[in-house]
């Protein structure tokens, strides 16, 4: 028992944050994380939690797709070896030739400092500069690595600092390298059946109105499909109902804030409205909604004696609600 106690005392909790390893032309930070996890499974480590996929502010203009960063948390006796190997993975797999600016952050401690939590909360709803991220790393003496301009440090820091108050799960299936960039062939009828069988335990799989499969991306990235759901059991079950002839490399389940509306829990200050911020305002409709070219609806609300112009764009599918607003409605 004494030897076991010594071993436990020598263990280190290592938090790993990764972001911006992909580009519109390829790669995916979750796929890189999948490769890292496959490596870690062969090491003498223990996973403390599920891999976490944190989707930050969706209004960031230079996001590749879902503005997601990844956190891995492990217990290890050899953090130096692990960190060196993960740095090699990020260097080798990141699509820097097509504009990726990867960031990698390591933090060794069981407890995450409040400063990380505050940074993460800002990243959910605001635009954080690279300068701010690099300053945070320097002031807190954080071990980090980046390529390009270091934009990925923002998500990497934020991923480590993120606190789950609600979560869903996302099962991501990955293609073999020989299939990257090729058309994804998946049975639409099987996805329709999967949704009707597993909803509401799974969500955002198929759009009935447009008769469109939602689980498959459209770019050349390594993801074949992703299923989102409320439980591990539900996403695994759903994946068994999806039919395709393509032989896949494997899959990984992430704990995620996808579908929780986390970035909308921020009440915006009417005197501090800025482009790209996410959040909500509460006000009263003060002019009649107008439908403009393209079917988009525009109106204004009054918030603390300030008039704020609002737009509801047609792709949101709530323009019918918006155009029926009347003066005095509180929204």
Predicted regions and their residues:
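N-terminal ordered "arm"
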Residues: 11-55
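Short beta-strand-to-loop capping motifs
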Residues: 18, 72-78
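Short, conserved charged micro-motifs
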Residues: 25, 78-85
């Amino acid at each position: 028992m004494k030897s076991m106690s010594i071993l436990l005392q020598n263990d280190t909790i290592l938090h790993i944050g990764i972001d911006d390893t992909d580009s519109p032309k390829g790669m995916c930070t979750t796929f890189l994380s999948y490769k890292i996890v496959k490596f870690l499974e062969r090491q003498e480590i223990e996973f403390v939690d599920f891999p976490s996929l944190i989707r930050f502010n969706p209004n960031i203009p230079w996001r590749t797709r879902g503005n997601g960063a990844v956190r891995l948390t492990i217990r290890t006796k050899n953090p130096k070896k692990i960190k060196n190997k993960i740095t090699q993975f990020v260097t080798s797999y990141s699509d820097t030739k097509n504009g990726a600016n990867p960031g990698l952050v390591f933090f060794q401690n069981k407890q995450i400092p409040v400063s990380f939590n505050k940074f993460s909360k800002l990243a959910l709803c605001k635009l954080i500069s690279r300068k701010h991220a690099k300053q945070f790393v320097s002031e807190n003496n954080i071990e980090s690595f980046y390529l390009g301009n270091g934009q990925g440090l923002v998500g990497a820091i934020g991923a480590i600092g993120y606190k789950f108050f609600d979560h869903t799960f996302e099962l991501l299936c990955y293609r073999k390298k020989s299939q990257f960039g090729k058309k994804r062939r998946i049975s639409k009828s099987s996805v329709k059946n999967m949704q009707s069988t597993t909803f509401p335990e799974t969500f955002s799989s198929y759009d009935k109105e447009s008769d469109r499969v939602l689980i498959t991306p459209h770019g050349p990235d390594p993801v074949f499909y992703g299923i989102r759901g409320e439980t591990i059991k539900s996403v695994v079950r759903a994946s068994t109902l999806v039919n395709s002839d393509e032989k896949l490399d494997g899959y990984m389940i992430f704990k995620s804030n996808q579908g929780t509306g986390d970035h909308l829990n921020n009440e915006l200050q009417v005197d501090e409205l800025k482009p790209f911020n996410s959040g909500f305002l509460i006000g009263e409709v003060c002019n009649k909604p107008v439908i403009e070219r393209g079917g988009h609806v525009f109106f204004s609300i009054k918030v603390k004696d300030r008039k704020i112009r609002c737009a509801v764009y047609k792709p949101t599918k709530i323009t019918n609600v918006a155009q029926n607003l009347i003066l005095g409605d509180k929204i």
